[in-house]
Regions:
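Short, flexible active-site-adjacent loop segments at beta-strand->alpha-helix junctions, enriched
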Residues: 25, 39-40, 52, 62, ...
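Non-catalytic C-terminal accessory region of glycerolipid acyltransferases
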Residues: 92-206
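Glycine-rich, highly charged phosphate/nucleotide-binding loops
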Residues: 20, 87-91
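Membrane-anchoring hydrophobic helices of lipid-metabolizing enzymes
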Residues: 1-34, 43-44, 52, 76-79, ...
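Catalytic core of membrane glycerolipid acyltransferases/transacylases, capturing the structured
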Residues: 27-86, 94
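Soluble or luminal CAZymes and related metallo-dependent hydrolases
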Residues: 4, 87, 175, 179
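Structural signal for conserved beta-strand scaffold positions within catalytic alpha/beta enzyme cores
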Residues: 23, 58-60, 81, 140, ...
Length: 206
């Protein structure tokens, strides 16, 4: 069922919101890991998810699950409902179980779509905590801009962020903030690499 959804959703997205994945090989790490990416559009989860042939899971605000048909659709696509207003223990347990079962988990650590024009909003600490608790890699990605119909967009896959110093240790508030900062730097660095790629691409055309 997932592969059917994947095929038709990607067909729709690529037809109306074309995009190119740069450095896709960096996403081909075996085993579970957490993907962190900036968040600009409702199509972001499909763009990021298309980096993987196997099913990847991602957090999705619980409001999308109010209607049975939508809840069924998003659940089939790997969505995990989360309450953004407070600490959602059930979502946390589901995420931990997902990673422990060897799956990939996509998180947009800004917590909402960025409509400010800034490169990133404040980064929440959940992604780093999940990765540290399960001892998995964190792979940063960066989307160039908000998706617009028939306008090509770009997604850059960065190299893993090293958080191994936190594996097997208690993650207190200070560690959570340090992990969030590492993730912030990793996403921004990946964005810089995307800009460099696009500049080089322009230079070759001249």
């Amino acid at each position: 069922m997932y592969r059917i959804f994947r095929f038709f959703s990607l067909l729709f997205i690529k037809l109306f919101f074309p995009y190119k994945i740069v450095n896709k090989k960096a996403a081909k790490i075996k085993g579970p890991y957490v993907v962190v990416c900036n968040h600009l559009s409702n199509t972001d989860c499909f763009m990021v998810g298309s980096c993987f042939f196997e099913k990847a899971y991602y957090l999705c605000k619980k409001e999308w699950f109010k209607h049975k048909i939508l809840a069924w659709f998003f659940s089939s696509c790997g969505a995990i409902p989360v309450d953004r207003e407070g600490a959602d223990v059930q979502a946390l347990k589901t995420c931990l179980k997902t990673l422990k079962n060897g799956k990939k988990l996509i998180i947009f650590p800004e917590g909402t779509r960025n409509k400010t024009g800034a490169r990133l909003l404040h980064i929440k600490g959940g992604a780093g905590v999940l990765a540290a608790k399960t001892g998995v890699n964190v792979v940063p990605m960066y989307i160039k801009e908000k998706s617009r119909i028939f306008r090509r967009n770009y997604l850059y896959v960065g190299e893993p962020i090293d958080i191994s110093e936190y594996f097997g240790k208690r993650v207190d508030r200070a560690a959570e903030e340090a992990l969030a900062e590492k993730i912030r730097e990793g996403i921004l660095s990946t964005g810089d690499k995307l800009e460099e790629y696009l500049e080089n691409k322009k230079a070759k055309r001249r």
